[in-house]
Swiss-Prot record:
Functional note: Catalyzes the phosphorylation of the position 2 hydroxy group of 4-diphosphocytidyl-2C-methyl-D-erythritol.
Residues forming the catalytic site: K11, D137
Domain of life: Bacteria
UniProt-recorded Gene Ontology molecular function terms: 4-(cytidine 5'-diphospho)-2-C-methyl-D-erythritol kinase activity; ATP binding
Organism for this UniProt entry: Geobacter sp. (strain M21)
Enzyme class: transferase
Pathway: Isoprenoid biosynthesis; isopentenyl diphosphate biosynthesis via DXP pathway; isopentenyl diphosphate from 1-deoxy-D-xylulose 5-phosphate: step 3/6
Keyword hit for Cell division: no
Record's keyword annotation contains DNA-binding: no
NCBIfam families reported in the protein's UniProt record: ispE, PRK14608.1
Protein name: 4-diphosphocytidyl-2-C-methyl-D-erythritol kinase
Database matches in Pfam families: GHMP_kinases_C, GHMP_kinases_N
A biological-process GO annotation: isopentenyl diphosphate biosynthetic process, methylerythritol 4-phosphate pathway
Length: 280
């Protein structure tokens, strides 16, 4: 039985601009995204028993077709025309419904893994075309580089330079529906569209970039998210922002010691999920 063990990393958004609503109902976005080394652990195995089986064991994460990783495997299995089974086991380390892209990363990792196991030889570009039909963030995780993401998140441009940073992720245990956030977003008009640099050489430059148009919506419904930002800044973060549609907030720190100290203190005093991670 052929199998692979893979890691599916989380991501943070240093920038998330909502530029407008498209005729197809999606929103036109502009984002700066980078992966971090908090990872779900995924095992993919080919079996002689036809069908796809996904097991996760995390409350709120479906095991069947409702799981985006299942749909990723199904897309490639149908494309291959092969009569094989695929067993997928996911050990979730990334908080669910938290703005960290865990589900999209799982799907991207399954696409890449099944492509390898079945010997399909699909390029990353082709996998990204398949992935965007599963979720807007899926192509980014196949791209594997810090990126400027435009469109619905599917048009990706690699950043020319970005520093390696220590980041503290804090999740207060609130599940935020991305669909709800976008439904309650009030688009403003007349705001100048600033030019986003493609190169960042320091922590200060990244901190100056931090902005998320979805943050006021989520914080309006869940004031605790604003409190998390304040706690991170009080713990020494040089900058802090909600990632994606929330509820995870991240803080950028000067070094590993500062990040680990802050994460341990926040977890101890507040009881929230807190992890010191590094960008990749």
């Amino acid at each position: 039985m052929k199998k692979l063990q893979l890691l599916a990393p989380a991501k943070v958004n240093y920038r998330l601009d909502v530029l407008g609503k498209r005729p197809d109902g999606y929103h036109e976005l502009r984002m700066i995204m980078q992966r971090v080394d908090l990872c779900d652990e995924i095992e993919i195995a080919l079996t002689d028993v036809p069908g796809i089986r996904v097991t996760c064991g995390r409350k709120g994460v479906p095991d069947g077709p409702g799981n985006i990783a299942w749909r990723a495997a199904d897309a490639l299995l149908k494309l291959s025309g092969k009569e094989v089974g695929i067993d997928i086991s996911i050990a979730k380390k990334i908080p669910v419904g938290a703005g960290l892209g865990g589900g999209s990363s799982d799907a991207a990792t399954v696409l890449m893994g099944v492509n390898e196991l079945l010997g399909l030889g699909l390029t990353d570009e082709r996998l990204m075309e398949i992935g965007v039909k599963l979720g807007a963030d899926v192509p980014f995780f196949i791209f594997k580089k810090p990126a400027l993401a435009e469109g619905i998140g599917d048009r990706l441009t690699a950043l020319e330079e970005v520093p390696s940073l220590w980041v503290v992720l804090v999740n207060p245990g609130i599940h935020v529906s991305t669909a709800w956030v976008y439904q309650n977003l009030r688009l403003t008009t007349g705001n100048p569209i600033t030019i986003i640099p493609r190169s960042y050489s320091s922590l200060d430059e990244v901190c100056a970039l931090l902005s998320n148009d979805l943050e006021p919506v989520t914080c309006g419904r869940f004031p605790l998210v604003s409190e998390v930002k304040e706690v991170l800044l009080a713990a020494g973060a040089r900058g802090s922002l909600m990632s994606g549609s929330g509820s995870t907030v991240f803080g950028l720190f000067d070094d590993e010691n500062a990040a680990r100290t802050a994460a341990a203190e926040i977890e101890k005093t507040r009881g929230w999920f807190a992890a010191a991670v590094r960008t990749i």
